[in-house]
């Protein structure tokens, strides 16, 4: 008979005591194209005519979902999800898990957890039957939001059984079979009130034994899975194998390593630079590595900020997700992008530009705000590269300036069609300025300009990094336009090679093997 973890630890089982949302409205399509166009019009924050929806709940969800990190209104998040769910439940759920997916998707926690809580209270059976999938795409602390939902008891049972399994592996010396559950389980003596609350819910359930048993279980398992936090707390610096640290831990605790183990840590970084050892960066976003510079005084434009060797090493170690494309990166540096969205925009621009396989467009970007400029990524350090493309123009969002710049140069030099960029990746919050023709959308005006100049329109990739309103630059009827969202470049190759219309691209991402287990 399988023993409980309290029995395994030899401790007494003394128990520790102490409304639905409407779907986002996707305008119904009439048989009349003019009526469809009129019903779907709205305006950006800067007064530009645009589309309220792509005319597909799935595409709207995909385009906004991974860019909602700063959205305070949970009803908007759930509304977008429900519009997609009403259109195709399986695709909506797969997109939700793609948004959360730490390794192959966008790694967004909050949006996933908001929707997971809603599902727990409104699609309880589905959540219960798929509890095991949550940790596969996210982390074990994602389960904690379910402790205040209709799935509370089932979640507690699931976590308790996993903890028992891990302890069985511990006592059988099967350490490689132990999950990361113990790393993310809440401690009742934590500093965070929310963490304390979750720990109390677990301990008062009667499924985790006494507080003493619970603490001992977590302590044993955390030692087995070799989490660096335990070694830091115990001041066991010489026992830390830096080459085995997870990506985020290597970045987060770098200053502690310098303070307490400087000589050995510096030698490790030298070995990384020489190719003798590796440093992990596979779960980091490019913006994670720009923030240590951008948060310094005048960090974006100052190439002489304090250079961080850990950041530099991890930037070089980032996986290369950029496919072979004949294209240019265009990044929004307007005032509304200040803060994290600006970091995401600049970091993705530098990341894509320097990994661009095109001999012509490699290391070139076009930042835009009130005007657009050609910029070349230059420098040896990441700080120098960021400074080389930062313009300091943080005013309005004149997207048309980008295309005016490209077409004016092309016409003046009689550039043939085959030498024009085939892709343009536009990284922005999508709050574009009004066109010179106020009755046309930015996309319509861009199409007009290319036609007037005698060039074919390139494939336009609108990459949403900060969704504040339900508006989109294109609809599903616009061919040659791809809509993405989020801060991770992990999906670039699939997205840019997955098709020529939005639904084809989304299907190529969420209908692959990685998300095949997610069914409704």
Q: Which positions does each model-derived feature cover?
A:
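Long lumenal/extracellular ectodomains of secretory and single-pass membrane proteins
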Residues: 2-344, 354-520
């Amino acid at each position: 008979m399988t023993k409980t973890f309290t029995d395994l630890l030899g401790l007494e089982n003394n128990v520790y005591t102490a409304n639905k949302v409407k779907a986002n409205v996707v305008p119904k399509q009439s048989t009349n194209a003019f009526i469809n166009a009129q019903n779907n019009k709205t305006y950006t924050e800067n007064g530009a005519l645009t589309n309220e929806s792509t005319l597909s709940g799935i595409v709207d969800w995909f385009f906004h979902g991974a860019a909602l990190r700063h959205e305070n209104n949970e009803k908007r998040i759930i509304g977008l999800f429900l519009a997609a769910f009403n259109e195709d439940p399986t695709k909506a759920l797969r997109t939700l898990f793609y948004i959360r997916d730490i390794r192959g998707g966008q790694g967004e926690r909050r949006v996933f957890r908001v929707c997971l809580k809603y599902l727990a209270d409104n699609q309880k059976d589905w959540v219960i039957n798929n509890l095991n999938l949550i940790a596969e795409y996210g982390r074990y602390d994602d389960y904690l939001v379910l402790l205040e939902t209709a799935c509370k008891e089932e979640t507690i049972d699931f976590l308790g059984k996993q903890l028992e399994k891990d302890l069985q592996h511990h006592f059988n010396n099967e350490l490689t079979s132990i999950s990361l559950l113990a790393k993310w389980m809440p401690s009742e003596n934590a500093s965070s009130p929310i963490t304390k609350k979750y720990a109390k819910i677990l301990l008062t359930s009667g499924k985790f034994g006494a507080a003493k048993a619970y603490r001992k279980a977590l302590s044993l398992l955390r030692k087995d899975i070799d989490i660096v936090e335990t070694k830091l707390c115990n001041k066991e610096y010489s026992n830390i194998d830096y080459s085995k640290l997870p990506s985020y831990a290597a970045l987060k605790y770098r200053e502690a390593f310098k303070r307490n183990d400087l000589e050995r840590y510096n030698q490790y970084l030298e070995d990384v630079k020489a190719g003798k050892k590796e440093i992990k960066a596979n779960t980091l976003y490019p913006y994670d590595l720009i923030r240590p510079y951008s948060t310094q005084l005048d960090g974006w434009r100052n190439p002489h900020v304090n250079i961080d060797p850990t950041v530099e090493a991890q930037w070089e170690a980032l996986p290369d997700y950029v496919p072979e494309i004949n294209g240019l990166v265009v990044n929004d540096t307007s005032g509304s992008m200040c803060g994290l969205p600006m970091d995401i925009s600049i970091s993705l621009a530098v990341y894509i530009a320097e990994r661009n396989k095109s001999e012509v467009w490699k290391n070139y970007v076009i930042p835009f705000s009130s005007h657009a400029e050609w910029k070349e990524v230059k420098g040896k350090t990441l700080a120098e590269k960021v400074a080389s493309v930062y313009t300091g123009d943080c005013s309005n969002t004149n997207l048309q300036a980008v295309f005016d710049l490209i077409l004016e140069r092309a016409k003046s030099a009689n550039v043939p069609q085959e030498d024009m960029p085939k892709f343009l990746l536009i990284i922005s919050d999508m709050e574009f300025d009004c066109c010179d023709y106020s009755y046309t959308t930015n996309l319509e005006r861009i199409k007009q300009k290319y036609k007037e100049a005698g060039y074919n329109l390139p494939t336009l990739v609108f990459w949403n990094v900060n969704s504040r309103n339900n508006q989109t630059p294109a609809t599903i009827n616009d061919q040659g336009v791809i809509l993405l969202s989020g801060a991770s470049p992990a999906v670039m190759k699939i997205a840019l090679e997955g098709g020529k219309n939005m639904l084809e691209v989304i299907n190529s991402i969420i209908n692959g093997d990685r998300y095949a287990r997610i069914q409704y």
